[in-house]
Amino acid sequence: MSRGASAAHSRASGNPGESSAFAARLTGSPLSRGRADHEISVAGVALIADPTGAVYWPDEALLVVADLHLEKGSAFAARGVLLPPYDTATTLAALARLIARYAPRLVVALGDSFHDRGGPFRMTGADRAEITVLQRGRDWLWIAGNHDPDLPDGIGGRFAGTLALGPLTFRHEPSPDQCDGEIAGHLHPQARIARRGRAVSRRCFASDGKRLVMPAFGAYAGGLNVRDRAIVALFGALSFTAHMLSERRIYAVAAAKCLAD
């Protein structure tokens, strides 16, 4: 995500354990009946949206995650902003659980996998070894992002600007034109709703059935409100759905019912 847009981000809530109360508040809501096996159809392709923010395409055994932002903590530390230096290990552990759950043939990391070009060089040996383990026995594709337009040798996997597979195109930054079948990241969508007298914000998928913008997967990645014009402009109006993440379920909420910041 660009530096300017990052400034508009709220700080990540990050802890999925906080979502249990959110789920309780949404129980029985007319907006959604939360599902663990939440399906989102994009250009006629049935995808499984995981409550962690990943997408699985069963027909292709393909797992997609966006905006890992590995080594964001160490990047901030270098500028004097001290954060616990465990974001890379936390993000990789969450990804390992996903891979164990879905056993994908191909993993696609949808850009901004590293917070900056120096990220791969700041990784601990243990974290680098974990990436090697995760890549074992499957294809792995790093999509170029604005934070990581190229990656050094030795990180494993393949590197590309986009991936076209069947009716779907995977890229980091959403195209400004209406693009059927596009799956992108970059914007870190987050939805905000009012429930029982308080506002609740959660990461979300944003989709109108033609295109899908994925939430950021990284432990320290923030979120941009789905009512922000950068997201609304992609869909032409508020005629899309925010699929809000909870600890174990996803809740579909009409974007028009979401709150602005």
Give, region by region, the residue ranges found by the protein language model.
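Extended recognition/assembly regions associated with phosphoester-bond processing machinery
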Residues: 2-4, 9-11, 15, 20-261
